[in-house]
Amino acid sequence: MPREVNIRIAGTGGQGVIKAGLVLAEAFALEGKNVVQTQSYGPEARGGASRADIIVSDDEIDFPGLRRVDYLLVLHDSAYRKYYPQVDGETHVIYDSSLVNARRGLGFPFTETSIREFGTPLFANMIAIGALTAMLGLQPEKVEVVIQKRMRKAEENVKAFRIGFEMGRRVTKPKVVSHVVKPYILS
């Protein structure tokens, strides 16, 4: 059984991909996990490629880069086209069905839900993190603590996170990260 989980969150500048990665990484750290979070983004303030990579482990992390992708969370079609070729048949692919035309994976209407609930797409990242949190088995309270501490509009971001958590909970049995099971194949 693997004791390490590798997560990639990908989208475009302006979607809050980096912030989502930081929130998720800090929440895992609050659970006592070893965590490495790296990020990459284009020079454009909005619209360029953006990604956050998170490695979570019970053991020490000896290399800060992803060796494989266990979970790929994609918020934009261009990011899907860029990062989907790097996954294998065991990678969990979760995507924003509002913006991504995916070949396989589990789609959720993150952006549509954000617009419907808040009148703006700006909370889609926290809705997506909520769904991913449910799938990973991360304690939602830990994520909410980080959101309250680090995010502007904390109340709305917590609400968005909870909406996403319920979306994710409805379709999966949570996995406890300290006892990660072999990922299931989404098709």
Curated annotation (Swiss-Prot):
It catalyses: 2 oxidized [2Fe-2S]-[ferredoxin] + 2-oxoglutarate + CoA = succinyl-CoA + 2 reduced [2Fe-2S]-[ferredoxin] + CO2 + H(+). Signal peptide: none annotated. Its EC number is 1.2.7.3. It comes from the Archaea. Keywords: Oxidoreductase. Pfam families: POR (PF01558). GO terms for molecular function: 2-oxoglutarate synthase activity. Disulfide bonds: none annotated. Heterotetramer of the KorA, KorB, KorC and KorD subunits. This is 2-oxoglutarate synthase subunit KorC. The lineage of its organism: Archaea, Methanobacteriati, Methanobacteriota, Archaeoglobi, Archaeoglobales. The gene is korC.
